């Protein structure tokens, strides 16, 4: 019975106008301890980590916990690429990506917190990184140029987006045909991952939400200790 109701709901979403379908996918509940009380496709959206917690992004244990070199290897980076780091924070990954795509490549480091972009710019300046361009986005728009991006990356960001469908649409517009979106999220399927439940996502949940925006699942990489790397492409 539940499956029939779910299928009916999906069919209704498919025949609605795009704006109406987006609104229908959102809901509200009593906020949980780590959530905001807003839901998307039945999932409560997690609270955002603000810029006062930026030190956590640069914690000494992060390399051991996340193995960034394994993620970078999975991204298929090449010199000259245009890459968007959406929810870039302090630039932990933006700087590493910049080194791999070279001076002819560009990293668009997107964040909605101006204070976080100040920290990012300071970090890039200290490290002598010149091919990272800060972009101040909004809750509904990444601010990325249309059809210009080879690869968009979100590391532990998607589950906190207050308007996930609008951001997915914005990313899709920014991707070149065949361009890829990569979501990195802590695995909800694994109880041993020591992260709060709302800050983890299952592969099935990620795929359900992203595929609803029209992007096509390509593969899932499972080489990271605690996170899965779910890769989609623009048709």
For the regions a language model picked out, list residue spans one by one.
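Short glycine-dipeptide loop
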Residues: 79-80, 103-104, 175-181
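A short acidic, Gly/Pro-enriched loop at the edge of an enzyme's catalytic core
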Residues: 140-152
């Amino acid at each position: 019975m539940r499956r029939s109701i779910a299928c009916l709901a999906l069919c209704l979403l498919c025949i609605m106008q795009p704006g109406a379908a987006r609104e229908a996918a959102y809901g509200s509940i009593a906020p949980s301890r780590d959530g905001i009380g807003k839901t998307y496709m039945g999932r409560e959206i997690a609270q955002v980590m603000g810029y006062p917690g930026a030190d956590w992004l640069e914690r000494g244990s992060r390399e051991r916990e996340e193995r960034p070199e394994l993620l970078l290897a999975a991204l298929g980076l090449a010199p000259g690429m245009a890459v968007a780091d959406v929810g870039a924070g302090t630039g932990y990954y933006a700087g590493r990506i910049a080194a791999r795509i070279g001076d002819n490549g560009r990293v668009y480091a997107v964040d909605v917190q101006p204070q976080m972009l100040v920290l990012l710019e300071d970090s890039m300046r200290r490290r002598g990184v010149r091919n990272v361009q800060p972009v101040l986005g909004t809750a509904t728009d990444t601010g990325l140029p249309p059809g210009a991006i080879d690869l968009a990356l979100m590391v532990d960001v998607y589950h906190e987006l207050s308007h996930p469908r609008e951001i997915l649409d914005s990313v899709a517009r920014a991707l070149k045909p065949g361009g890829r979106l990569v979501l990195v999220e802590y695995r909800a399927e694994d109880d041993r991952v020591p992260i709060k439940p709302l800050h983890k996502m299952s592969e099935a949940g990620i795929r359900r939400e992203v595929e609803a925006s029209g992007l096509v699942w390509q593969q899932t990489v499972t080489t990271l200790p605690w996170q899965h790397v779910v890769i989609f492409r623009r048709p």
